[in-house]
Amino acid sequence: MRRVVAWQRHGDADKTDMMTLAKGLTGAHLPLRAVVVNEKVSKHFETEMLFTGLTYTGHPLACAAGLAALRAYEDEKLIKRSRLLGGEMFLELEQLKQRHCLIGDVRGGHGLFAVIELVSDATIREPLAPWPQTPPQLAGLVRKALSMGVSFAVRGNLIILAPPLVIEENELRDALVLLDRLLTEMEAT
């Protein structure tokens, strides 16, 4: 929740009618999900009952964890932090794209979440391997990064960056420097 602050990327004037929340609502410690609606939608359900849930509805421990997580988001200003650090991360990834012919596309820029698409030829954006295969050289990059304490998620030709909202600026910078170095090594082979 709030990693990408995607609903805010269209500006404050764009109001959402309905939003679903889940894993991040409790910091992924307990299962809890919610559907948050605006006043217009809420009024509809005052007269038209929606029968859902039962077993896990309103579980007190999960709700308490959700409340604590929401307080932490506000108290620690994690949303603002996600926007700022995510913006810096995305700018650095765009610079990496200029330096590395393996990078075909960088997607994200709305918070601490981004995807790098790796290609064998940037001009035609040919993937390194057919989807959903992970190219061996990319699997090697991930293993090297992990041996140095940095975890990059991979799906096929995609590197997924989703650092924790509480990551320190120097840790994020170090991870991006490492990624730059590992991409350079990958291009040399």
Task: Give the role of each language-model region.
Residues 1-189:
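Conserved N-terminal phosphate-binding loop of PLP-dependent enzymes in the Aspartate aminotransferase
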